[in-house]
Amino acid sequence: MIRFVLLAVVVLSLMLPAPALAQDTIRVLDEGVEAHFRDHITFRITVEGDQPIQEARLFYRVTGLPATARGDAEFTPATRIETSFRIDQTRDYLPPGSEISYWWRITNAAGDTLKTEPQSYRYMDDRHNWQTLSNERLMLYWYRGDQDFGDALFSQANRTLDLIETEAGVRVERQVQIFIYGSHRDLMDAIDVGAQEWTGGQAFTKHGVVVINVSPNDLEFGLIAVPHELTHIVIDHATDNPYGDIPRWLDEGLAVYMSGELDVAFRGYRDMVAAYARQNQLMTLQTLSSSFPADSQQANQAYAQSGLVVEYIIHHYGKDAMAKLLQIFAEGSTYDDALEQALGVDTWGLDNAWRESISAAPIEIPAGATTPARGAPADTATVTPAPTATASGATPTATAITPTVAATPTDTAPTPTSRQTGDGRRLPCLSAGLVGVAVLVFFATTLRARGV
């Protein structure tokens, strides 16, 4: 009897019409992206169906950022619609070269849903006629200067990547986009409104984008600024973890070391640090583990010391030790634990070892002194001001500083680069907020039931 019933069910199911596939009931006729830099990015789609189209929802994510955003297109339901969703770039800034992956989810009146295949779009500054050079590691864009100018910057960037791999054991994970703006005004028009007028460039580490002002007659600056910011991006990607950043002195010190700034005449970093050492005015590594000073002279000292400490680690402990240190940080270690595992010293011990190597007076470690455990993870940005000469001698002077910039990029210029929180705006994630509300409601209900 059971066998007969099962057979009847199978026969009836075969006789019933098969449910319509979404691809049959909803058809995408056309889709694409239109954009104008610093104004908008508009995603367009044309759809038809057997039933009225009720909903067209765009999902998009900026490569390098963790959140996926959602946008609902507005239209009047019909069996054929043309609609779009616009990202306002006057408010939600993205740097040039940002890569966006996106897809649509279309729903009709019958509840059928179609998800389009994910596509990729690179957001460009369309106001310039870019020349390009590229390989699997880098894409260089410039519009002022001849081929030799572009070749020089591209070769320097590739040498920097080779040096980072040799000296720190780190490889670039994805292609980095480098934009060379031919004037300071053009650069300022390309970056977020919060940038300072002295900014010479920015590195958007999470986006994998560098933007720098290098005119054809200022190639010397470009040959330093490009490696500096490129180092920030590579190191950030290599040590990225959900627990915290690497110490500020290590991050900036690697950028100074890899760019060759320690031996650039207009920086004068070695003479500067020697002068501060003679005056017993060196900063402690504990101080340099977090934010750098806002004062320009002190900021330059911070960059110079950081670069020399990184040089000391590589020369004294070895390249393998530096590679091990970065790997430990990538796993989410605290500052002192990472240093002790890789070098056998904590922050205070490393500080005094380096001071001894330059014949500087040791520091007395305060009783109960501690080093910041680790910095909060951040979307970072570095800033480079325009080149200035740095005086050396008895009274150290500093070049233009790279102060902390609010909410987005990192900057570069022949002055120190500074890190900031927010390498780009995070896209909204409504679902996370709803989950948080649900958790709070659950606990409140539970406590009320228990009479708490």
State where each predicted segment sits.
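C-terminal membrane-anchoring or membrane-association module
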Residues: 431-452
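Solvent-exposed coil/turn segments that connect beta secondary-structure elements
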Residues: 50, 145, 183-184, 261-263
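Juxtacatalytic substrate-recognition/specificity segment
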Residues: 129-247, 275, 292, 302, ...
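Bacterial N-terminal signal peptides that target proteins for export
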Residues: 1-6
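Glycan-association/targeting regions that enable binding to alpha-glucans and other polysaccharides
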Residues: 19-131, 136-139, 452
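Ser/Thr-rich, Proline-interspersed low-complexity disordered segments
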Residues: 7-23, 137, 359-421, 429
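Acidic/His/Gly-enriched intrinsically disordered linker/tail segments
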Residues: 197-209, 214, 220-225, 237-381
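C-terminal soluble interaction/assembly domains
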Residues: 333-336, 418-424, 438, 443
